[in-house]
């Protein structure tokens, strides 16, 4: 039986929620990943160092006994952010600030309305070597939802990089050929996280044969040519600029299957197996370890994990749902098969 042993991966983009939801989902990530970069879009958002440290304590308390998993904490960037907050965050071990353009995604109401007014804050981030994580979509209602990432590149990303050229930027959960091209052409201070869904699915998987609410995420799935461009990027010559970031975003089944369903896919349960499928299909299994376990750590300036995990070429059926607080959670590829399995 074929096996593949790799350095234990890190998830560089993860939503863990809070309370009972946190307790339900964190064990799935903790058994696969050594560390994860924790998104700050709680209600209310994680905007201060005190907020982040309190949230980290709640995550640690929710971990299974004996787990060595480490959450890497971030702050939610708001219009009120200051250079002083950046210095305070760096001193407290916060790894990054996250940009949510106001209204772009789940719990983004407190997001930034005009990033260019925060240039002094971004300059301080560059000075302190603290990362800037970007949800790269414009929220202009006149821009088609499928074009919002490409528009963001021209309107925001390129001008910001021109004004703060040494800022370390992660273009999060990229979905388009344009985003891949930007990262490929930018300096070594720009990298990207890529989700399993944007490497495996296209917008037909969301819309053909009926609306598939469990395939609805933001940024929304794009056409097949974009998916292929992402696979080419993560397996190509400059693959070191791309890394694993699941954007696993749990929402109760009832919140997904309704007239105005929430955006987000829960992939943490089988994340590494899903990525293995991508790299296997691309004939690039030898590049999975760098993508999952090395590139993110290098960009964040942290050491690689010292232990390993082993994948077995063995089919598994993903559960139709799992418990989630008072309700249930539908994982990515619920009821379907994945050709790999992590040995636990």
UniProtKB/Swiss-Prot annotation:
The active site is at residue 247. Substrate binds at residues 15-17, 41, 135, 218, 251, 263. Binds 2 Zn(2+) ions per subunit. GO terms for molecular function: dihydroorotase activity; zinc ion binding. It catalyses: (S)-dihydroorotate + H2O = N-carbamoyl-L-aspartate + H(+). Gene3D superfamilies: Metal-dependent hydrolases. Its cofactor is Zn(2+). Its EC number is 3.5.2.3. Zn(2+) 1 binds at residues 13, 15, 98, 247. One of its GO terms (biological process) is 'de novo' pyrimidine nucleobase biosynthetic process. Pfam families: Amidohydro_1. Keywords: Hydrolase, Metal-binding, Pyrimidine biosynthesis, Zinc. Belongs to the metallo-dependent hydrolases superfamily. DHOase family. Class II DHOase subfamily. This is Dihydroorotase. The gene is pyrC.
